[in-house]
Design a protein with these regions (language model features):
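NAD(P)+-binding Rossmann beta1-loop-alpha1 motif at the extreme N-terminus of oxidoreductases
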Residues: 1-56, 63-67, 73
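N-terminal Rossmann-like NAD(P) cofactor-binding module of classical short-chain dehydrogenase/reductase
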Residues: 79-80
C-alpha cells in the first residue's frame, strides 16, 4: 500500500531518519526539511545521514531535501515532526 499525498519529514536527527526510512518504504518520494545545508549536501553525497543512524542507506533520488521550511510545508500534504 502506497501512502497518499506528499509527505514531509521535519528535522534531521535520529528520529526523523528512522521515520523517513519507514515512510519511504510506503511512498514513492518524500520532502525532507533539514536546518543545515552542509548536512543535506553530505547526506546526498554519502547516501545516509552523516550524524545519525549512519548504517541506514537511502535512495537519494526519492528525497527532495531543503533547508527552506516554508517551501517544504507548501509542497507537502502531511508533515511528520
Amino acid at each position: 500500500m502506497k501512502l497518499p499525498g506528499k509527505i514531509a519529514i521535519m528535522g534531521g536527527g535520529s528520529w526523523a531518519t528512522a521515520i523517513a526510512k519507514i515512510v519511504l518504504a510506503q511512498a514513492e518520494s518524500i520532502n525532507w526539511y533539514m536546518r543545515r545545508d552542509d548536512r543535506i549536501e553530505e547526506f546526498k553525497r554519502l547516501g545516509h545521514n552523516p550524524a545519525y543512524l549512519t548504517s541506514v542507506r537511502f535512495e537519494i533520488k526519492n528525497i527532495n531535501f531543503s533547508s527552506d521550511i516554508n517551501k517544504i510545508v507548501k509542497e507537502s500534504d502531511t508533515l511528520i515532526f
